[in-house]
Amino acid sequence: MAQVAVSTPPIAHEESSESRMVVTFLVSALESMCKELAKSKAEVACIAMYEADVFVIGTEKGRAFVNARTDLQKDFAKYCVAEGLQEVKPPGPANASRMQVDSGETEILRKAVEDYFCFCYGKALGTAAMVPVPYEKMLTDQEAIVVQGLPEGVPFQHPENYDLATLKWILENKAGISFLINRPFPGPANQPGGPGVVTDTDKSVTSPSESCTPIRVKTEPMEDSGISLKAEVVSVKKESEDPNYYEYSMQESRHSSAGTEVIETELPMEDSIQLVPSETSEDPEAEVKIEGNTSSPNITNSAAGVEDLNIVQVTVPDNEKERLSSLEKIKQLREQVNDLFSRKFGEAIGVDFPVKVPYRKITFNPGCVVIDGMPPGVVFKAPGYLEISSMRRILDAADLIKFTVIRPLPGLELSNVGKRKIDQEGRVFQEKWERAYFFVEVQNIPTCLICKQSMSVSKEYNLRRHYQTNHSKHYDQYTEKMRDEKLQELKEGLRKYLLGSSDTVCPEQKQVFAKVNPRENAAVQPVEDVAGNLWEKLREKIRSFVAYSIAIDEITDINNTTQLAIFIRGVDENFDVSEELLDTVPMTGTKSGNEIFLRVEKSLKKFNIDWSKLVSVASTGTPAMVDANDGLVTKLKSKVAMVCKGSDLKSVCCIIHPESLCAQKLKMDHIMSVVVNAVNWICSRGLNHSEFTTLLYELDCQYGSLLYYTEIKWLSRGLVLKRFFESLEEIDSFMSSRGKPLPQLSSQDWIKDLAFLVDMTMHLNTLNISLQGHSQIVTQMYDLIRAFLAKLCLWETHLARNNLAHFPTLKSVSRNESDGLNYIPKIVELKTEFQKRLSDFKLYESELTLFSSPFSMKIESVQEALQMEVIDLQCNTVLKTKYDKVGIPEFYKHLWGSYPKYKIHCAKILSMFGSTYICEQLFSIMKLSKTEYCSQLKDSQWDSVLHIST
């Protein structure tokens, strides 16, 4: 849609802004209709006028027809104005003078607005010079360039079409007006009459300061008036080594005047404007002449029967730091496409490295090089002339694109291309790349400080691509001083890494590197780097928690040092649960509750954790943890109450070690001691073990060997006992033959106790495996323990009746009807212990039920602060359906924002530890990882290993 202004006498009655908005809307609708008609190959041309504005609407050919006949537009405007003036009284002398004053003021304001629009457009292109605004293209493609800051209801158009009041408003509020380039206009189109071209005989474009003499650039057509003259392309280039840059097409214009007609554009010298030929130009012939105090020669690019595109290159100063993010993305796309074409061209000529593509020669010599695999509708050309959508399609089809050299390109020698001489390319490693991309130069080879990978060429594009692809996600967080410190740390790590191989490379210089520990430098440093990234991620994750809980357990490593393991479980606002190892603290000296509290407080402070969000603490239930006077839980509750008044820290003993239950409550040490000694004696001696395996094989027993009992892997207790019981005769025979008889194996009472212990440990193993399920919720754990307690009550009743249905091993050796009665006291001991563990959950049973069964919860049992929201929730059939469909905790991710208090309550319950999985996982890692060699690691290094493992 084109828009033209005509001079009309002012009319006393002006339409309101609402009327203008209606007209603009209807004109836009009419334009949309024209686009649909064009799809059906129908041509439409329409001239519309509103107030002093003339709109040209229609299809591309229709608008071209009307734009080429400006007299027709003026006649139509005069006709409409004349019709309107018939109803207006002629102005008197006073009004006539007023009109002349307003007309003069309007012209001045329009000129000022037009200059400011040119300045804003130039600023959007990245230059301080004023650049003519392509009004017609902007009105045709309104999404390409967006003008922000205009008054509501006033569309962007040429200043000649604004009334006096609008012009004044624009100048008064010009500070808020800006141009935003969403996508640059493509190369010169064949659309005539573009209004963005400077058509005056001497039109100067200067910067607002106008402090320097402008350079005048004349473009003269080389052919007669029948050949269209295309306007300049303004290229904005950031000084760098990359050959690609941005090109923004100014509006073109088709002239039917004589060939001597000249278009002039003046640019200030202070903007460092240079006229250079495009290396990738494939446009027809033209000539650019430079007048003024310049030494640049005339530049002429010729080809048979075609014109050339004149490119004005505007160099942005080095201190230009503010760049549009969209422009940076376009630059990256062009770099990627150019790199792709270079690699494909290199493959075509038989080399394994990228080779600069001769775009001009390929274009002007069709048939020499064939490019297959280009996306449909995309023509091969230099990346500087490709649209954004075309470049993206090319990258998507990268694997399909192939260059084939049919015959040599004229003037291009390919014989020496395969012998790449990097030292002759003159590339120098720049010091600023160390801080930007963490690269250093080692023996003239760029080497990455992070992954130790080297690059063959000191080229910024290659270094930047490596950093952004592999390391930017983790290392962009280091800025300013922290980045400098990290750079020095990585440099020191690289130095040690290189020195670590000195024994192999130069053993004669071994004494020089005697102080260097290769194993520590080559292996530990990367582990610390990886763990450092994980620590930073953990800190970031903790900051997003709305509620969290901690679990504390004690571990003993291979050095017999007690390690206090602190785990954290948190929930963010999206109800995503995270369960991580927070810290491990060696416990030397006393292990009192106060000492443990100080260690925990220090660890939480290290991560800047908010105490007010702490919901619960899970512990082992030892006196140092739960002592009413000086235990850790008591100290933590006091701390939370002091930080956040009214908060009540919950305490649960969810870390259950069944081996302690068996030893302390079942009192079956007389069984375990015999089994453990016998199994370890057989398995720890290779000869004994092999002979025993052979014996079992000859006897065709169920198992080929015994499981080695380990204290740390307590789950093996049940498996060892079961396998031991089923191999009693073989073990008795083998131990007797080796002079180590076991008289207990001949005692029926001892065998019955063993059988009962086998059944009981298998039940406990089943429970604990259920508790160790990953990502368990505390309500699920509560249900599992309640179920096991109910089973204990059932077993007590069955044993009183000598019903051994749930004790199959004991049943297989039972001979008397009273055998079951002997084990009732042991069941009672276990039941008492589990009731004690369950008492912690009983205190919060209503809160847990509200979380797990919100729609069946009685309102009387709900806290008063939550009652209103729970009533609304229970009456919401949509949420009830969602609850039945997805269950918990997935349901709470769909909970609406109208239940803020209930959502916080659910987040707190969800943050409570409901599993011992992560604790048992850490036990296994400690056993497998901390060998006698790894035990020599420092505490900080061992923390890194554990954190990576968990």
UniProtKB/Swiss-Prot annotation:
The species this protein was found in:
Bos taurus
Which PANTHER family does UniProt cross-reference here? GENERAL TRANSCRIPTION FACTOR II-I REPEAT DOMAIN-CONTAINING PROTEIN 2, GENERAL TRANSCRIPTION FACTOR II-I REPEAT DOMAIN-CONTAINING PROTEIN 2A-RELATED
Q: Which domain of life is it from?
A: Eukaryota
Q: Tell me if Transcription is a UniProt keyword of this record.
A: yes
One molecular function GO term is: DNA binding
Major location category of this protein: nucleus
Name of this chain's protein:
General transcription factor II-I repeat domain-containing protein 2
Write out the GO cellular component annotations. nucleus
Q: Where in the cell is it found?
A: Nucleus
GO terms of biological process kind: transition between fast and slow fiber
Q: Name one Pfam family in it.
A: zf-C2H2_12
The upper taxonomy is: Eukaryota, Metazoa, Chordata, Craniata, Vertebrata
Entry keywords, A to Z: DNA-binding, Nucleus, Repeat, Transcription, Transcription regulation
Report the family membership: Belongs to the TFII-I family.
Cite the repeat ranges for GTF2I-like: 100-194, 324-418
